[in-house]
């Protein structure tokens, strides 16, 4: 029994589990959290019910962790071939495949319990979220557009939030959802540019490879479409003009990102990717201004 606990629950093992769930890298959680907050506050026309807000924040943390576990499980044979991912717990053997599968199921069970605390409408929508989380990691083997599936996975909290608050999916919901997809494809392409050379060598597909020398131009186009959809969203929602001012200020971050990725240097592309959480926060502030000003 002592040996069992030493193997599976030692301090080093807990650290490995935390790294597998990316608790040491909160950027992904933030990129998932901000669109969720957009939708919750937009659907409620202000502060959503506190219980719903807490459930969704916890759900974001849990599902982000689950997504990382299943992603690393799917990539366990190729992560060791990529410089950026070579030290991940599954790639180095610090976490076994059995442990990863058990952890994934445990996280899904926690998410299931959280879903039970919401209305039936949202509970049914949650099955799509689970399906997208499971499908996404395997898409890079079959298509150059896995980032689109990631955008759907990261954005599905938006219809769930509308469902939880209003039990409806109005046009505003879908404008936010598709804005999030275009934004996600843009920032995850920046992320994929970091690994492009390694991905080409091992045969992994991504939008960074698909877009090739047009990558920066297409990223800029995707960001422009994101802004157009967010402007339409604010107009239909009849937000105060302050929303558009804050959104415009947030959009200036895209110009900075384009400058960072201009030379396609790995470190600079990664900085551009990280910069996106400020945009997500900016849009959240814009929505608050639009509602309360």
Swiss-Prot record:
GO biological process, one term: ubiquinone biosynthetic process
Coiled-coil spans in chain: none
Entry membrane topology: Multi-pass membrane protein
Gene3D superfamilies found in the cross-reference section: UbiA prenyltransferase
EC top class, as a word: transferase
Co-factor requirement: Mg(2+)
Catalytic activity: all-trans-octaprenyl diphosphate + 4-hydroxybenzoate = 4-hydroxy-3-(all-trans-octaprenyl)benzoate + diphosphate
Superkingdom as given in the UniProt entry: Bacteria
Location of this chain's protein in the cell: Cell inner membrane
Protein name in UniProt: 4-hydroxybenzoate octaprenyltransferase
